[in-house]
Amino acid sequence: MTSCILAGSLETTPKVSPGDPEAKPLIFTFVPTLRRLPTHIQLADTSKFLVKIPEEPTDKSPETVNRFEYSDHMTFSSESKQERVQRILDYPSEVSGRNSQQKEFNTKEPQGMQKGDLFKAEYVFIVDSDGEDEATCRQGEQGPPGGPGNIATRPKSLAISSSLASDVVRPKVRGADLKTSSHPEIPHGIAPQQKHGLLISPTTSEQLAHKPPAFSFVSPTNQKTPPVPANVSGATVLREFHTRRLDVTGASEEETTTYFHSTAHDSPLSAWKGASTLVVSPSAQLSGSSLCGSNVTDHTRGLASEAQKKMSTSNVLNPKEDVRTCPAPASGASLTSPSASYIPVRIVMHSLSPSPKPLTSSSHGSLSTVCSQMSSSGSLSKSGLKSPVPSRLSLLTAILKSNPSHQRPLSPASCPTFSLNSLASSTLALDQKVKQTPPTSKKSLSSGSLTTGSTEQEHQASAASYQPCHLPFFSKTTPLSQAQPLSPLALASNSCASMDIEKIPGSTLRSNTTSPQPQTDTFSLADVPSVTPVLSPLSSSKGRKDGDSRTPEKNRNICIQPSTLASTPPVDESLALSSSGKGFHPSPALSDLIDRSKRACSQQHPGQRPSPSALPTPPVSRAASASHPHLGCSILPLQSSLTQTLQPSPSALRPSCGSATCPSRTQMPENTASNHSSRVSTPSLPVSLTRTKELFSPCALSMSAGPENKKPKQYKTMSSYKAFAAIPTNTLLLEQKALDEPARTESNSKASVLDLPVEFCFPAQLRQQTEELCATIDKVLQDSLSMHSSDSPSRPPQTMLGSETIKTPTTHPRAAGRETKYANLSSSSSTASESQLTKPGVIRPVPVKSKLLLRKDEEVYEPNPFSKYLEDNSGLFSEQDMAIPHKPVSLHPLYQSKLYPPAKSLLHPQTLSHADCLTPGSFSHLSSFSVRDEQEKSPTLLSQDTYNKLGHPMVTIPEHDTLDSKE
C-alpha cells in the first residue's frame, strides 16, 4: 500500500503541480483559495501550491518508499488493520480518482479560489522528504472513503490534496501526518490540514516557520499520518495533502493541501478533529509538521473538538475522551461543525536547500510562524475573509524572504529563530486576530488558537497564538504522540498532548517568563514516557481544559505516553533545548524560543503546572498500563512514533527516546512523573528502542531520511542511499557534517549522553553498512574480475585452438580489450582492497589502468601472443602458402582481376568465425591481395611478412580453406 500510495502521490502530485517533479524551477502560483468546498464545505485551498523543487525525484522514490513502508507500518499499528486495509483498498482507486480529481480539482479549485478571491499561494518550503506526499495520499485516500458525504464534495480537492499530501506528507507528514495519525479519523484531513490548515493562512508563515522544521517534525507526523489515514477514512473531512517533490535530498517541494472537511462523515475524531485540526493546524503547523500533526491533532481534538463540540454543544473533554476512547462521540461532536471546519489547504513546501537538516531547522522555526499565519489565513479562508489574501501574500513574501534564513542555517535553531521570533510575533498576531475573528468552528479550524473551546479555547487560543512560535519545538514531540494515535486512545491522548503542547508553545511564546512550569511539565512528562513534552503540554492543556476530567486526561496521557514515548524525543528535544538545551540540536535561537514558549506555558498555565505534574504522574502510570495496552494495540504506533522520534530528530529524539526517556527525563521530571516515566518509559523505551531498532533498518532509515527532515537521521538515510547510489563525495561529506553537527549539539545537551549513543549508532551503523556494502562490492568485483581474467586468458587459447590462427588473433585483441576492461575492474577492486576499499560514489580508474598494464605484463598475451600467433600463423601460412601457390596460382588471375577472392576469403572466415574473421576480413582482402600477389613472387616469405604486418594471418587461412573447399 505504501508503495502504491507513493506512486499515486507521485503521479498525482505532478499532475497537480504545474511543474514536473523532475523540473526544478520554483513555481510560485497564486491561485485564489477555494474557500468553498464543492458542496457545503468551505474549501480554503492553498493546497494548490505547486511550488516544486523536484531536485530529488530519484532520492524521493527510495526515501519515499521507505517512508511509505514506515508510514504503512505506523498506519498499521496506529490505525486499525481494517482502516489500513480500507485505506489500501481505497487507495488504488483513490489515487487514480485523485489523479483525475486532482486535475479536476485543480481546475475547480482555482475557480473556487478565484471566486473566493483568496490566493492559493505556492510557498517555497524546505522539504526534505516526500514521504508526506505518500502519507497525504493515504490521507486523501482514506479521507474520501472515510467521509463519503464530505468527501463526495471534497474528493477532487481531496484527491489533489491527498496526492500532494502524499508527496508532502511522507517527509513532512512524517511529523504532520503522524500527528494527523494521532487523530486517526482526521489523519488525512488533519495532518495535512494541520499543515495545510495551519498553512492556509500561515501558508507563507508556515513555509517560513514550516519549511525545514515543519517538515522535520512533519516527518515524525508522517509516521503518525499513516495511522491517521485509517482514521482519516473516518475523518477524511480534514485532509491535508502534502506533496513533497524532493524529499530525500532535503531540498524537496512539499505541497500540502488540507481539506478540513469536518463533516461527521467519519468518526468524531475525523469531524471534530478536522475542525479542530484546522483550528489547531495553524498553531500545530506553527509548532511544526510533527507537532502540527500532534499539536494540531491534540489542539484539534481539544480546540476543534471544543469548537465543534461548542457548536455541537459537546464538552471538549468528551470529544477528547471520545477521541481517545472512541472516535464515534468525537464524530458526533465534529459533525456539528464539520462543514464549517472543512478547510482544504495545500501548502507546497519547497525544499530549496538540498540537505534535510536545513529543512528541519526551517520547519522548527517556521512552524510557529506558519501556525500563526495558518491561524489568520486559515480563519480568513474559513471565515471567507478575503482580506487575508494580501496578508497571505505578505506572508508568502515573508516566507520567501525568510526561507533563505531557514535554508541557510543548517541548524534548526536558525530557522526556528526567524520564524519563531519574527514570524511568530507577526503570525501570532495573525493567529490571535484570526482566533478572535473567525467563527468558532472556523476559528478553531483556521486559527492556531483553540478559541472554540471557551475556557480551553481561550487558553488554547492564546496558547495556539503563541503556540505557533513554540510549536516548532514541540512539533517534534507531537509527531511521535501522533504516531501513538494509531490507537484511538493514543489518538485521543496524542490529540490532547498535541493540544497541550500547542497551548504550551503558544503560552510559551506569549510569556517567556514562565519557563519553569513548561519545563516541569516537560520534564515530568518527558520522564513519563519521553513523551513528557507532549504530556506536559497535554497536562497543562488538560489542566486547563480537562482539569475536571483528569481521568480522561490520564487516559489521554496514557495514550499519549506511548505516543509521547515515541514523540517525547522531539518534545524533549524542544523542552530539553529550552530547559537544558540537551536534546534539541537546533541553534540557540531555537532554544531561546523553546525557553520562551516554556515561560509562556508556565505563565499561561501556572495553575496547570501541578495539574500537568499530577497528570503526568497518573498518565505516566496509566501510560505504563495504557502504554502497554497501547503497546499491544499501538506498540507499532509507539514504535513508529519512537522511530519517528528517533529518526526525525536523531539527536534530540534519539536522546529522548533511546537514552533520555528513562534516565535523563526521569531525572528531569518530578519524582512522581519520573517514577511513572521510568515505569512507562521503561516499557515504552523497550518499545521505542526495540521498535526503533526494528524499524530503524526498514523504517527508521526511511523515517530519518524523510520524516523528520532532521539532518542527522535524514542525512544518515540519505548518506546510505547516496552512498549506494554513488553520490559525489562532497554531498556525502556535507551529510556527514550534518550528521556530526547534531551529535555535537546533542553532546552539549544534558540528554546528549544517552542520546548521542543512539544518534551515533545511526551514523555509525550507516557507515558500517556502507563499508560492508563497499566491501561486498569489492569482493564481487574482485571475484568477477578474477573469473573474467581467468576466462579471458582461457578464451584466447580456446579461440586459438578452435579457430586456429584466425580466431586467436582477432579474439586476442578482443580478449585483450575485454581483459583491459576486466583488468580495470579487477585492478580497481584489487587496488581498492589493497590500498583502500571502494568508497560509495567514488570510482578510481587510475589504479585500474596500472593493473591493466600489470595484467598485460603478466599475461603477455598482447605482445607475445600476437607474435607467437603470427609466427605460428606464419608457419601455417608458409605451409599453406606453399600449397597456395599451387592452388591459388590458378585462382590468382581471379584475385588480380576480381575481388572475389577477398570476398571469398571473407566468406570463408565467416564460416570459420564470423565475428573474428569479419574484423580481419577487411584486412584479409588486403592481405589476400598482397599475399597472393606476393605469393607469386615468394609466397611463403611475403605471405608471412604480410600477415605479420597486417596481423591478420588468420584471414589467409580461411581463404585457403575456402579455395580448397571451392576447388
Curated annotation (Swiss-Prot):
Residues 132-154, 302-336, 432-462, 506-628, 644-685, 786-838, 929-967 are annotated as: Disordered. GO terms for molecular function: DNA binding; lamin binding; transcription corepressor activity. Residues 437-455, 528-541, 826-835 have a biased composition (Low complexity). It comes from the Eukaryota. GO terms for biological process: negative regulation of cardiac muscle hypertrophy; negative regulation of cardiac muscle hypertrophy in response to stress; negative regulation of transcription by RNA polymerase II; transcription by RNA polymerase II. Predominantly expressed in the heart and skeletal muscle, but detected at lower levels in the lung and brain (at protein level). Also detected in smooth muscle, thymus and kidney. In brain, expressed by a subpopulation of cells within the hippocampus and cortex. In heart, expressed by cardiomyocytes. Expression is reduced in hypertrophic hearts at the transcript level. However, expression in hypertrophic hearts induced by transverse aortic constriction do not differ from control at the protein level. Residues 144-811 are annotated as: Required for interaction with ISL1. It is a peripheral membrane protein. Residues 543-556, 958-967 have a biased composition (Basic and acidic residues). It is found in: Nucleus; Nucleus envelope; Nucleus, PML body; Cytoplasm, Cytosol. Induction: Up-regulated by beta-catenin/CTNNB1 in mesenchymal stem cells (at protein level). This up-regulation may proceed through the down-regulation of UBE3C ubiquitin ligase by CTNNB1. InterPro entries: MLIP. GO terms for cellular component: cytosol; nuclear envelope; nuclear lumen; nucleus; PML body; sarcolemma. Keywords: Cell membrane, Cytoplasm, DNA-binding, Membrane, Nucleus, Phosphoprotein, Ubl conjugation. May be ubiquitinated by UBE3C ubiquitin ligase; ubiquitination is followed by protein degradation. Its main location: nucleus. Disruption phenotype: Knockout animals are obtained at the expected Mendelian ratio. They are viable and exhibit normal cardiac function despite myocardial metabolic abnormalities and cardiac-specific overactivation of AKT/mTOR pathways. In aged mutants, cardiac function is depressed with increased left ventricular dimension. They show an impaired capacity to adapt to stress such as hypertrophy induced by isoproterenol (ISO). Residues 508-523, 558-567, 658-685, 800-811, 938-947 have a biased composition (Polar residues). Pfam families: MLIP (PF15274). The modification Phosphoserine is found at residues 129, 792. PANTHER family: MUSCULAR LMNA-INTERACTING PROTEIN, MUSCULAR LMNA-INTERACTING PROTEIN MLIP. Required for myoblast differentiation into myotubes, possibly acting as a transcriptional regulator of the myogenic program. Required for cardiac adaptation to stress through integrated regulation of the AKT/mTOR pathways and FOXO1. Regulates cardiac homeostasis and plays a role in the protection against cardiac hypertrophy. Binds chromatin. May act as a transcriptional cofactor for ISL1, repressing its transcriptional activity. May also repress MYOCD transcriptional activity. Directly interacts with LMNA. Interacts with ISL1 (via N-terminal domain); the interaction represses ISL1 transactivator activity. Interactions of ISL1 with MLIP1 and GCN5/KAT2A may be mutually exclusive. This is Muscular LMNA-interacting protein. The gene is Mlip.
